[in-house]
């Protein structure tokens, strides 16, 4: 059960809108070394997720942040509904590694996902749209070869095949009172290569290139039947990705040091972007569109230090320069887009985190460990809308700096574990990428029992 407090914008407040449901998810994991033949290792995983979501928006009042309310002309704070959505999600993966001698490894990987959603209105007669289920099937197959003649270097080449089938209702009239079932299927080939080389014993370089595709998610295609509206005509993102990394890892007696730095370049086409749209009457919704081209240049730095299995401290800093790379307003014209070269909105571009953990091993009894962890996250302010539109100071998600504290006690080498966590320790004002305020200080407790050997 979850109360829906806000819409997709902070100024939209709900007082009687809620969502409830349940989920069942059995899973299977199978692993076998030397499967039928020596050198062939197989891993098979599968899970089934059946969940029901009931979106209820039947209030006859509208609210403000002070809790005050006034009658609505028509019931429904966002859109009058009491809708049940039954979602069935099947996932499976197969990974097979075949080693030939010490230098050659072939890997085959296949991921399959099947999704089906059926909707039912609990208020009145179902619409034609609800009579048509929303379905998708994804298949991603990959084959790679790795050459590792020595411990000093290795080289990998790989190919991937992507396929996605989509089916769902589409309106045939502007009044959206008549629907038909439409289907679409897309497929693509991805590929790439990666290599690593030890310049020194503790200094490693990594270089990779990939022609990659990202298939639209279920929410991007079908929405959430409430505040999000999907688009089944979305095209997959495709990008050229280049990564260069240098890492240093060394141990000096009881001291360990790890340092890594990386450069990132991505040239993305058909970038899938979430937008906030005005539905009139002070109501807003989220939609998804393909944005022609986006270019990303960035770097990240990670550092970690450990001492005698007693303390671990580290941090990470990332700078991502994600820019609109669409030059003209429409294809085939010379009119330059106002947002060309501007930073893409709703994306943090400078952020950092750090943490420190202390361990007390064999505390009170051998095999028991007490750990205390402090971590934080810094996020620089970033545009809420395109920098080319409006005042930069007015339309930004503000800078944020949050702190967390976790206490964990493991018993019998981790078979039993008790943990307590305080998120947002100093009760800072935190926001998501669309400036929706997150929860304040919160406390959590968790007990875990491992039943394996």
Describe each PLM feature range.
Residues 19, 207, 235-244, 308, ...:
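Conserved C-terminal beta-signal and adjacent last beta-strands/turns
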Residues 259, 264-267, 287-383:
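Gram-negative outer-membrane beta-barrel transporters
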Residues 1-14, 54-63, 68-69, 118-126, ...:
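Outer-membrane beta-barrel translocator domains and adjoining extracellular loop/strand segments
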Residues 198, 204-210, 236-297, 318:
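Membrane-embedded beta-barrel scaffold of Gram-negative outer-membrane proteins
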Residues 9-18, 76-83, 123-132, 144, ...:
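Extracellular loop and loop/strand-boundary signature of outer-membrane beta-barrel proteins
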Residues 22-28, 88-94, 137-143, 161, ...:
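Hydrophobic, lipid-facing positions within transmembrane beta-strands of outer-membrane proteins
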Residues 33-37, 99-103, 148-154, 198-202, ...:
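Outer-membrane beta-barrel channels and translocator barrels
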């Amino acid at each position: 059960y979850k109360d829906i407090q806000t819409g997709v914008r902070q100024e939209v407040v709900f007082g009687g809108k809620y969502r409830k449901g349940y989920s069942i998810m059995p899973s299977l994991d199978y692993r076998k070394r030397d499967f039928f033949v020596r050198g062939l290792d197989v891993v098979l995983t599968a899970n089934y997720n059946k969940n029901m979501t009931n979106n209820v928006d039947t209030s006859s009042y509208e609210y403000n942040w002070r809790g005050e309310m006034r009658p609505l002309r028509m019931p429904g704070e966002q859109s009058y509904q009491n809708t049940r959505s039954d979602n069935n999600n099947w996932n499976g993966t197969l990974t097979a590694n075949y080693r030939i001698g010490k230098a050659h490894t072939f890997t085959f990987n296949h991921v399959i996902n099947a999704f089906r959603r059926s909707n039912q209105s609990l208020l009145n007669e179902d619409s034609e749209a609800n009579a048509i289920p929303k379905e998708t099937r994804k298949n991603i197959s990959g084959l790679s070869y790795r050459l590792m003649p020595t411990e000093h270097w290795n080289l990998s080449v790989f190919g991937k095949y992507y396929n996605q089938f989509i089916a769902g209702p589409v309106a045939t009239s502007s009044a959206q009172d008549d629907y038909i079932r439409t289907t679409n299927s897309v497929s693509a080939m991805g590929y790439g290569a990666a290599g690593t080389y030890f310049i020194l014993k503790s200094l490693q370089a990594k270089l990779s290139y990939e022609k990659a595709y990202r298939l639209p998610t279920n929410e991007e295609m079908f929405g959430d039947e409430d505040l999000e509206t999907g688009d089944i005509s979305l095209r997959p993102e495709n990008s050229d990705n280049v990564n260069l990394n240098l890492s240093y890892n060394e141990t000096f007696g009881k001291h360990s040091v790890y340092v890594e730095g990386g450069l990132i370049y991505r040239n993305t086409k058909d970038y899938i972007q979430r937008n906030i749209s005005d539905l009139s009457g002070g109501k807003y919704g989220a939609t998804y569109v393909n944005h022609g081209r986006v270019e990303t240049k960035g770097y990240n730095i990670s550092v970690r230090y450990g001492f005698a299995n007693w303390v671990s401290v580290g941090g990470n800093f990332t700078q991502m320069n994600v820019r609109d790379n669409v030059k003209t307003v429409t294809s085939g014209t010379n009119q330059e887009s106002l947002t060309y070269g501007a930073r893409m909105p709703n994306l943090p571009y400078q952020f950092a985190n750090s943490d420190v953990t202390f361990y007390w091993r064999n505390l009170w009894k051998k095999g028991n460990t007490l750990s205390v962890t402090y971590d934080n996250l810094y996020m620089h302010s970033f545009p809420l809308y395109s920098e080319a539109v409006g005042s930069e100071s007015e339309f930004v998600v503000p800078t944020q700096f949050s702190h967390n504290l976790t206490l964990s006690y493991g018993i019998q080498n981790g078979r039993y574990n008790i943990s307590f966590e305080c998120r947002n320790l100093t009760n800072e004002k935190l926001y998501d990428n669309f400036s929706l305020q997150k929860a304040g200080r919160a406390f959590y407790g968790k007990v875990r029992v491992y039943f394996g050997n």
